Amino acid sequence: MRLLFLLLTLTLLSCASDMKVKNFENETPKFVLEDYFDGKTKAWGMFHDRFGNLKRSFKVDITGTLDNDTLTLDEKFIYNDGEKESRIWSIKILGDNKYSGTADDVIGKATGISSGNALN
């Protein structure tokens, strides 16, 4: 019984391990946020509930403008129910592959770091 408990505990702990962006440092192509989003980008996505049921989908047109150490992302969303939404991100390029971003309708500050072909 103790062995079963130990195995279950180790299994659960392995699920909680952090993904380390550094593990991707040798992967290519190298992802550079400001290069990728400078200009026009189209994206799409969807929201699911916890049971996997599709709740909403969207398309987004993104215009990225780079000015010195700031990348501005102007996002225009169109949802499948016809709703439209806009968001403007101001992303500071901090150096050493680190970023910090804010948007008026988002509480707090987003932070990120890239390594190789990954961004976390």
How would you describe each model-predicted region?
Residues 1-8:
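Sec-dependent signal peptide recognition
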Residues 8-10, 40:
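Intrinsically disordered/low-complexity terminal segments and short unstructured peptides
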Residues 12-14:
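C-terminal motif of bacterial Sec signal peptides marking the signal peptidase cleavage site
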Residues 16-18:
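Bacterial signal peptide processing site
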Residues 24-40:
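N-terminal helix-cap/turn-to-beta initiation motif at the start of protein domains
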Residues 44, 48-120:
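Central antiparallel beta-sheet cores of small beta-barrel/beta-sandwich binding domains
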